């Protein structure tokens, strides 16, 4: 049974200053084997509707491990609207312009209109208990800058998405004092995380705790001018059912 969830994230920021990086940033939870896995980063495939140099995802050894830009997958996905969040779901029957055997099942969300995405992948989908599931985030951090003062974000989160709902919450960052707190609210599930920001890149990493005792890690990235978007993941080795991806726009 799919459980509702609550995520609380507390991130210590080292400083507030412009981020001059112009490349793609991303991350994913650990793979469960050497065949069924994804990898987030800069897209490398330049064929058909696919373009290199964008936020991308690869499927293990599939297509020689070339990363496909997520934006080119979006038109083939089915959209599921839950509140203010549009989740795109995509499986082997999506009609992609390349062989679909082994593609698995994606649920992913675009943050605003930017080339910034978060979601999850599994080899079997919700109908078969999300085998080999991984969560991910990826986006273009060109022109990212971190402002002074307080910024807030409306968040959504993905965890074993079966079409019924997404996590909802908010993030508040006081960039004068260097602290960020966030929460994704559900029922019966608690996640807490803390970390620090690399001011040169806009990336953060740290620890996470599920249900008060299960220890994991958190990582993520601020994107855009004025830190207009944020995405990240919380992961738990040996307890991947708690792995969650999240993201949102600055209010």
Model-inferred region functions:
Residues 21-251:
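Mature soluble binding/inhibitory domains
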Residues 16-18:
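N-terminal signal peptide c-region/cleavage motif recognized by signal peptidases
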Residues 1-8:
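Bacterial N-terminal signal peptides that target proteins for export
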